[in-house]
């Protein structure tokens, strides 16, 4: 038998809220690896 045959689930990264969309406090705007995009004024960054 082979030792391959495994695959991880997709990580669903990317932009979650686009310009003009209404957001509430706590909404996720972008999911990314590292800090490719930095938050602007009055926007926090978790983890």
From Swiss-Prot:
Keywords: Chloroplast, Plastid, Ribonucleoprotein, Ribosomal protein. One of its GO terms (cellular component) is chloroplast. GO terms for molecular function: structural constituent of ribosome. InterPro entries: Ribosomal_bL27, Ribosomal_bL27_CS. The keyword Chloroplast applies. It comes from the Eukaryota. It is found in: Plastid, Chloroplast. Residues 1-21 are annotated as: Disordered. GO terms for biological process: translation. Belongs to the bacterial ribosomal protein bL27 family. This is Large ribosomal subunit protein bL27c. It comes from Porphyridium purpureum (Red alga). The gene is rpl27.
